[in-house]
Swiss-Prot record:
Its main location: membrane. GO terms for cellular component: membrane. Disulfide bonds: none annotated. The keyword Repeat applies. Belongs to the MPDU1 (TC 2.A.43.3) family. It is found in: Membrane. Pfam families: PQ-loop (PF04193). Residues 27-93, 150-205 form the PQ-loop domain. The keyword Secreted does not apply. This is Mannose-P-dolichol utilization defect 1 protein homolog 1. The chain crosses the membrane at residues 25-45, 62-82, 91-111, 123-143, 174-194, 202-222. It comes from Arabidopsis thaliana. It is a multi-pass membrane protein.
């Protein structure tokens, strides 16, 4: 019995016989189900960040470069997976993350007006080149090189935000919930990637994501806790 690429016959057969499914049967099943869960969960990952920006009408403390690089990274990753005909459960979340990342950058641009000429040029170039990349109409060697560079791109996307947080001693409008979901999703992807026998480079990228998102989460907790303490001290002085 195969449903959405998930082979259920092994597990169902064991349960019918009153037996608990064996490890070799259960782990791949869990991996597939977890993969589809991550795809479903990815539909809301960046919504807390988008809502926080819209509600506060502010992008204070956010690194524009960081979010722009995320869009590039998701674009390359999704295009590569589509052209390699990988199963949707293995990369489906990339489609939803890219859509949300584009909305997020649009929100940042909207609340950062007036926009510079450079910003307009970057936006035009992206929408001019992206369709070609998605169609796979580029040199195969260049495509492989772009995909190999995605880990560096995502790492570069986190570093400006981490540095800005450290420099300002504040995380501004960063959403803790979005960072937490990114962190948890990366942890789950370690398991699914090992089960799907993903290449070492992919695992390395996931580990880097866990590390950088962990740093940003700790910064949010540290600086917001410090900010609350400062407010408490000021209120006591006033009273």
């Amino acid at each position: 019995m195969d449903y959405l690429g998930i082979d259920l016959s092994c597990a169902i057969g064991s349960l019918r016989n009153g037996e608990f499914p064996a490890k070799d049967c259960l782990l791949p099943l869990i991996s597939k189900l977890l993969g589809y869960f991550l795809v479903a969960a990815s539909m809301t990952v960046k919504l807390p960040q988008i809502m926080k920006i819209v509600d506060n009408k502010s992008v204070k403390g956010l690194s524009v470069v960081a979010f722009e690089l995320e869009v590039i990274g998701y674009t390359i990753s999704l295009a590569y997976c589509l052209n390699k005909d990988l199963p949707f459960s293995a990369f489906g979340e990339l489609a939803f993350l890219l859509i949300q990342a584009l909305i997020l950058v649009a929100c940042i641009y909207y609340f950062s007006q007036p926009l510079s000429v450079t910003t307009w040029v970057k936006a035009i170039l992206y929408f001019a080149i992206a369709p070609t990349v998605f169609a796979g109409k580029i040199d195969p060697f260049l495509f492989e090189a772009l995909y190999a560079s995605k880990h560096l791109i995502f790492l570069s996307a986190r570093i400006p935000q981490i540095w800005k947080n450290f420099r300002n001693k504040s995380t501004g409008q960063l959403s803790f919930l979005t960072c937490l979901m990114n962190f948890g999703g990366a942890l789950a992807r370690v398991f699914t990637s090992i089960q799907e026998k993903a290449p070492l480079s992919m695992l390395l990228g996931i580990v880097l994501s866990i590390f950088t998102n962990g740093i940003i989460m700790s910064q949010i907790l540290l600086y917001r806790s410090k900010g609350n303490e400062d407010k408490l001290v000021k209120s006591k002085k006033i009273s």
